[in-house]
């Protein structure tokens, strides 16, 4: 038999029973004839299913039923407009080591150039994280070696640590005390990859900040952005925890009506996408009208029609060729859950606009 040339790491999981030592060592495995470590009787792929972007999933269906995705150019354009660009908010002071401030004397040209650079840097900071479908659980069993049952009391993880392999395709397997050899779950993969390829800001074990009671405390202090920043650093965008924390945060913002907390942040677009997908845009729409963001309100209804083209609102707007404020009125009369409230808010806005025009 040809020697096995892949270097693997052996790691005893943290979930082992009390009193059992954790083992970590590097070994180059050389199979021997008649030994326990033999080639598997059946062939299997060394890779793992890659995460499937929503656009790829949509392409598998028929062109007629293709649903717009988060990364579509039209969708991204609308979300970027609604996010806004507030340099004061984007570059607000962060908690860090105290240093004396730096003052510069600039000419008008230098000031304009510095402002331009700040705007470009802000656009990079406002780049929206991807919105992905939840990844499919890994339940692949590779072998059932009953001869190994009872020889160990802990699980062992074998990880291919070659640098040239993308993490999503990295081969990681788990040997159970029962003798079962299986592919590692996503959670086990994330922990092992963090052990051997540490990512800044990410912990091996999930921080306690993501416990329900701690999240409620953070929300009560209006620290929703901090929660999302920590979530983005800790979890993969298609993991169950990432999606769950984001949805909880969006729901809390909607309940409190504090949409402005995420405006001019990288998470505003994801929040809007969540509300539009779940047909819960009434609160955000009212907030935009009250803040004199009528263009954003129109864009919100436009995006709603893009995602729900067969709804009464989209059909009504198409029949009436509605634009601008009329687009909002059509939505309020057809699919809005708080239609009367939206119409009243819109009426108040128009009256204030008329008074302002008359005064000027």
From Swiss-Prot:
Major subcellular site: mitochondrion
Modified residues (Phosphoserine): 54
Annotated GO biological process: mitochondrial translation
Outcome of mutating residue 135 to Q: In ODG7; uncertain significance
Subcellular location: Mitochondrion
Keyword Mitochondrion listed: yes
Superkingdom of this protein's organism: Eukaryota
InterPro entries in alphabetical order: Ribosomal_mS22 (IPR019374)
Family: Belongs to the mitochondrion-specific ribosomal protein mS22 family.
Disorder: Combined oxidative phosphorylation deficiency 5: A mitochondrial disease resulting in severe metabolic acidosis, edema, hypertrophic cardiomyopathy, tubulopathy, and hypotonia.
The name this protein goes by in its record: Small ribosomal subunit protein mS22
Taxonomic source organism: Homo sapiens (Human)
Gene encoding the protein: MRPS22
């Amino acid at each position: 038999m040809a020697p096995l040339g892949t270097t693997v790491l052996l790691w005893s999981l943290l979930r082992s029973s009390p009193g059992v030592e954790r083992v970590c060592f590097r070994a180059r495995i050389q199979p021997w004839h008649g030994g326990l470590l033999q080639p598997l009787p059946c062939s299997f792929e060394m890779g793992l299913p890659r995460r499937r972007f929503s656009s790829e999933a949509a392409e598998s269906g028929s062109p007629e039923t293709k649903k717009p995705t988060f990364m579509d150019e039209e969708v991204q354009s609308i979300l970027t407009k609604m996010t806004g660009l507030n340099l004061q908010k984007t570059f607000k002071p962060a908690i860090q080591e105290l240093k004396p401030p730096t003052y510069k004397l600039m000419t008008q040209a230098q000031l304009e150039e510095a402002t331009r650079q700040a705007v470009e840097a802000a656009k990079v900071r406002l780049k929206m994280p991807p919105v992905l479908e939840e990844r499919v659980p890994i339940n692949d069993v590779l072998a059932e070696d009953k001869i190994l049952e009872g020889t160990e009391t802990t699980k062992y993880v074998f990880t291919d640590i070659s640098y040239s392999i993308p993490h999503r395709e990295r081969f990681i397997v788990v040997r159970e005390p029962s003798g079962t050899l299986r592919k590692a779950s996503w959670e086990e993969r994330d922990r092992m990859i963090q052990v051997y390829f540490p990512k800044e800001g990410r912990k091996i074990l999930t921080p306690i900040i993501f416990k329900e009671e701690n999240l409620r405390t953070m929300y009560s202090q209006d620290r929703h952005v901090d929660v999302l920043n920590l979530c983005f650093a800790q979890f993969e965008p298609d993991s169950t925890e990432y999606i769950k924390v984001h949805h909880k945060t969006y729901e809390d913002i909607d309940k409190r009506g504090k949409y402005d907390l995420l405006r001019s942040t990288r998470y505003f677009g994801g929040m809007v996408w969540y509300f539009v997908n779940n047909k819960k845009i009434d609160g955000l729409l009212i907030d935009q009208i009250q803040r004199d963001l009528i263009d954003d309100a129109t864009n919100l209804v436009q995006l709603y029609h893009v995602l729900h083209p067969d709804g009464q609102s989209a059909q009504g707007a198409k029949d009436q060729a509605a634009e601008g404020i009329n687009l909002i009125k059509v939505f309020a009369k057809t699919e809005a859950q708080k239609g009367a409230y939206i119409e009243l808010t819109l009426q108040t806005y128009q009256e204030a606009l008329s008074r302002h025009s008359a005064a000027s």
